[in-house]
Amino acid sequence: MKVQDMDKCAPSSDWNVLYWVLGTVLMPVALPLAIINIWQRFQAQKFRNQLPGKVVLITGASSGLGESLAHVFYRAGCRVILAARRTQELERVKKDLLALDVDPAYPPTVLPLDLAELNSIPEFVTRVLAVYNQVDILINNGGISVRADVASTAVDVDLKVMVVNYFGSVALTKALLPSMVKRGSGHICFISSVQGKFAIPQRAAYSASKHAMQAFADSLRAEVANKNINVSCVSPGYIRTQLSLNALTGSGSSYGKVDETTAKGMSPDKLAERILQCILRKEPDIIVSDVQAKIAYYLRHLCPSLYFWIMAKRAVKLENAEKKST
């Protein structure tokens, strides 16, 4: 063989060595993950066939992701309970669901709920259990957001966000948990946010409430694992909903604007389908976001100094933009 021919063969040989090394290193990890993924898909299909007739309670069901979740679970044949403050909007969602061609179809139940009124939640759960005597799947989706920096946010606003986003879901979960434990089955799904994984400027109150939700879900999951109760925590990125439009300012007034990031966010319908799969597969914790948010998540944990530097730059940029707009 000529020298030139040997040179031509060298890269191929090098690549073969590289592939062998990567295969040797990654195969022990990749193979079990692939098997787990196949098993989860099999289980998801199995449990999807068991969904018809399941009782699903969805908070924040009057619009946005909650409304999309109502459609997804209703089409799956579930007995859906719609909960939120705005009864008129819940009735609209119910009417839309009844117009769908679904078999089997159970008429949705509308029950008004204000997560900020913690003392009313035990009575709300009594009404829920009076309808179907059980809840198979609880989806803690209701919540509000804030658009303001720490210095300009009133403590009352911090408190309101924490009560609605965290304590409301905690109170509802605690009120329903005994019935799930007694039956020996149930699934509790917390709709958190990527901001429950890492914090960004001008979202302190919102991010704090989602961090608290994440911690609560993780603790609860461990405590009920031996009781046949599953706990999932879903952390989405930006979603095309009215979350920013309905957000609060630091003083507690209405923000009243749709952020560019929200407008370009993922479809709530697609996210609702992914959440259904999460519950069917009994996935404990998932992040559903674009690549940028996932990079931020890994930076926060693997290279925190760089993450903090990026966030500091972002804070200055947001502050300057706010000054120009006023």
From Swiss-Prot:
Peroxisomal face residues: 39-326
NAD is among the record's keywords: yes
UniProt KW keywords: Membrane, NAD, NADP, Oxidoreductase, Peroxisome, Signal-anchor, Transmembrane, Transmembrane helix
Ranges per topology, Cytoplasmic: 1-17
One Pfam family of this chain: adh_short
GO cellular component, one term: peroxisomal membrane
Entry's Gene Ontology molecular function annotations: all-trans-retinol dehydrogenase (NAD+) activity
Enzyme class: oxidoreductase
Membrane topology, record value: Single-pass type II membrane protein
Binding annotation for substrate: 193
Function: Putative oxidoreductase.
Origin species: Drosophila melanogaster
Active site (UniProt): 206 (proton acceptor)
Protein name as catalogued: Dehydrogenase/reductase SDR family protein 7-like
Protein family according to the UniProt entry: Belongs to the short-chain dehydrogenases/reductases (SDR) family.
Membrane-crossing residue ranges in chain numbering: 18-38
Enzyme Commission (EC) number: 1.1.-.-
Binding site for NAD(+): 57-81
PROSITE patterns associated with the record: ADH_SHORT
Compartment(s): Peroxisome membrane
Keyword Cytoplasm assigned: no
